[in-house]
């Protein structure tokens, strides 16, 4: 389902090249420095950022029923990121040629190098330690079961997710309908946000360049408002704290080093489809709105601790 949702929003599926990425008994595999790894969900963004190494997104999916994903899983994902990002295709001829001081230019195996960003999707949440570790190492955490469409989707699929008695075409239609009202944002700390439009069946759009965020309590989704449209999204508590804290620090630094009459802002990138075409937009939030979100987050934390 995760793969289908992201493709519906506009991400591109990565096809196996039969060498660096290949199809194995466990599914799609990706080569690493130490070994090959199973790729649960492997995608490319609809548009790459100019002047940077092209990126791909690898999502590890965990379904532990009621058990939260712990530190061991997220720590393993960090190792996975290091292993696949440090992989290089080199043969003995290249190694021998490197020993010659008057050698010709050495061309390694011809393939496009990618920087892989990692995320973990869970249907049962994450422990506090896992969240803190992920925030430190910029590993995105997705609480799939807290997305607005989750309960509806589970009712359609049935409780036994391993034995789904539903036609593939029908499932694709359902996912396409849901994803047509969704966007994906990437925050300044690398966290993925699934934005679900709350304005009925209206098409996803971000009319202005500014947004505001709010939430009622830790058991409910966050709300992002842009123009006259509202989007709900999930965010693990400790990740939310890290995001707001970093955004406030970012604005503070801009105030110190940039002389401008305009208010400094913190930015994030949003990917979505409009009229069946991919769109990328940068949204900004100012210090006052961040402080309001921080205040609400602190109040919720104090209530829980009291």
Please place each PLM-identified region on the residue numbering:
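Mixed-charge (Asp/Glu-Lys/Arg
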Residues: 1-306
């Amino acid at each position: 389902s995760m793969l289908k949702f992201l493709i519906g929003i506009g991400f591109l599926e990565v096809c196996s090249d039969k060498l660096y990425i290949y199809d194995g008994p466990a599914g799609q595999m990706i080569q690493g420095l130490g070994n090959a790894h199973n790729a649960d969900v492997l995608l490319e963004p609809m548009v790459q950022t100019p002047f940077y190494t092209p990126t791909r997104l690898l999502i590890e999916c965990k379904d532990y029923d009621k058990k939260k994903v712990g530190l061991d899983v997220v720590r393993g994902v960090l190792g996975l990121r290091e292993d696949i990002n440090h992989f290089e295709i080199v043969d003995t001829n290249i190694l021998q040629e490197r020993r010659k001081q008057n050698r010709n230019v050495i061309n390694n195996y011809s393939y496009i190098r990618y920087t892989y960003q990692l995320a973990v999707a869970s249907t049962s949440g994450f422990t506090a330690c896992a969240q803190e570790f992920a925030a430190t190492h910029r590993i995105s955490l997705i609480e799939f079961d807290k997305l607005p469409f989750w309960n509806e989707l589970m009712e359609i699929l049935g409780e036994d997710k391993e034995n789904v008695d539903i036609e593939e075409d029908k499932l694709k239609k359902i996912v396409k309908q849901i994803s047509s009202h969704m966007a994906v944002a990437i925050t300044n700390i690398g966290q993925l946000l699934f934005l679900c439009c709350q304005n009925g069946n209206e098409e996803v759009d971000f009319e202005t360049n500014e947004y505001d965020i709010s939430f009622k309590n830790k058991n409910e989704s966050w709300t992002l408002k842009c123009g006259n449209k509202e989007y709900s999204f999930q965010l693990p508590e400790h990740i939310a704290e890290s995001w707001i804290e970093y955004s406030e620090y970012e604005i503070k630094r801009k105030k110190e080093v940039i002389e401008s009459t305009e208010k400094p802002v913190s930015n994030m990138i949003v990917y979505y489809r409009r009229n069946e075409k991919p769109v990328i937009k940068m949204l900004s939030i100012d210090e006052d709105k961040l402080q309001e979100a921080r205040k609400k987050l602190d109040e919720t934390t104090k209530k829980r601790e009291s």
